[in-house]
């Protein structure tokens, strides 16, 4: 299956870089690889992905730049919020996206925008923890490495009491707080077969056996700088240099992975909030209902269950986004969706009561994508 896919890339003049995992090496030794090339058209090589893909596989792409990013050769889809199961904290979100991008005019080649706006939504400390310093390991005794990693917030070896208060910073089993810290420690201090990495790193701290400077500290420091501190600093610099962050999402099955999506910036596109919200209202005088952020209401049935709209579109609209100007709407289901919703609501018996705010719950799902509020109504007592 791979041969024709690779041949298609070669016929188009693509260049490949191949990597082979060394014999005996584990997957934990695989490190991120960054390739830089001149170009102005970001691309996700999705055709290669189909070799090992599964049905409805989630694909999320982040873009840092000066403006919002949109797909070039794929469609852009707005999902229908009425099909979201708000009462279950949007547990069916992936299914809604899948059905929306698989619908008419999208045909499995489309993305939804989950966020578009100021890149400051990601704090620099989240990608570049303060205090990272490879030079701190130079000249350090081997049995002090764990303590230094704890100090730089790369390991957590703390012991806490029942109230969550820390009373020992390095006395407990250690957990790596960065995916490359564990492999780095294993490279220089391999875990014996009779124990676990978490316990071994704890025992290594202050160990008399490793109370020595006769170990490749400079090499460890260089690896730490190359794999952890340096990339973190670069990520922080990228956040500072690019004011706009776009997050796109889709799901695809192997049969749909026939074209690599490309992307472009469009300075005229509006921002997209990552707060996709609704309010669930429980009414003592009638069925529960949901109030969407745009003011529309979804009535529940008399049993307190949300409606199931089997024939209602999952896409609110399907668009083609140019490099400048407003999106071109290829398919607009808004009127049909409203008609079906109105017909459902008209068939339900709604109660009447005074509204009181009883609960506000912000359930941040998928990068703060959803916020669910709940309010209760009760009768006014004279």
Task: Please describe what each predicted stretch is.
Residues 149, 352-354, 368:
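Extracellular cysteine-rich microdomains
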Residues 362-379:
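A cross-kingdom C-terminal cell-surface attachment/processing module
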Residues 346-350:
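Compositionally biased, charge-rich terminal segments
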Residues 3-345:
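Accessory, solvent-exposed terminal regions and/or long lumenal/extracellular loops of proteins
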Residues 352-364:
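Juxtamembrane/start-of-transmembrane alpha-helix segments at the extracytoplasmic/lumenal side
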């Amino acid at each position: 299956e791979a041969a024709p896919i690779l041949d298609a890339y070669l016929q188009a003049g693509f260049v490949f870089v191949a990597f082979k995992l060394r014999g005996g090496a584990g997957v934990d030794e695989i490190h991120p690889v960054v390739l830089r090339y001149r170009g102005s058209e970001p691309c996700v090589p999705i055709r290669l992905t189909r070799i090992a893909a599964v049905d409805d596989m989630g694909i999320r792409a982040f873009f840092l730049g000066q403006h919002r990013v949109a797909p070039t050769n794929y469609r852009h889809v707005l999902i229908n919020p009425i099909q979201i199961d708000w009462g279950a904290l949007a547990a069916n979100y992936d299914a809604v996206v899948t059905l929306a991008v698989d619908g008419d005019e999208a045909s499995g080649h489309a993305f939804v925008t989950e966020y578009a706006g100021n890149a400051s939504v990601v704090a620099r400390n989240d990608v570049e923890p303060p205090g990272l310093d490879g030079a701190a390991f130079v000249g350090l005794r081997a049995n002090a490495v764990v303590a230094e990693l704890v100090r730089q917030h790369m390991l957590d070896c703390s012991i806490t009491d029942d109230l969550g208060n820390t009373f020992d910073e390095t006395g407990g089993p250690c957990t790596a707080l960065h995916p490359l810290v564990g492999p780095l420690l294993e490279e220089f201090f391999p875990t014996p077969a009779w124990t676990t990495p978490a316990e071994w790193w704890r025992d290594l701290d202050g160990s008399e056996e490793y109370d020595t400077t006769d170990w490749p500290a400079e090499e460890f420091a260089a690896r730490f700088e190359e794999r952890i501190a340096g990339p973190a600093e670069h990520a922080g610099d990228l956040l500072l240099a690019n004011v706009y962050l776009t997050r796109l999402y889709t799901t695809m099955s192997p049969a749909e992975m026939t074209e690599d999506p490309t992307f472009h910036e469009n300075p005229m596109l509006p921002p997209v909030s990552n707060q996709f919200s609704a309010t669930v209202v429980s009414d003592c005088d009638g069925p529960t209902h949901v109030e969407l952020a745009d003011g529309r209401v979804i009535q529940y049935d008399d049993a307190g269950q949300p409606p199931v709209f089997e024939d209602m579109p999952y896409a609110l609209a399907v668009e083609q986004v140019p490099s400048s100007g407003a999106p071109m709407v290829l398919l607009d289901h808004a009127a049909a969706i409203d008609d079906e919703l109105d017909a459902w609501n008209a068939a339900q018996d709604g109660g009447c009561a005074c509204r009181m705010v009883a609960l506000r719950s912000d359930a941040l799902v998928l990068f703060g994508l959803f916020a669910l509020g709940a309010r209760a109504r009760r009768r006014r007592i004279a």
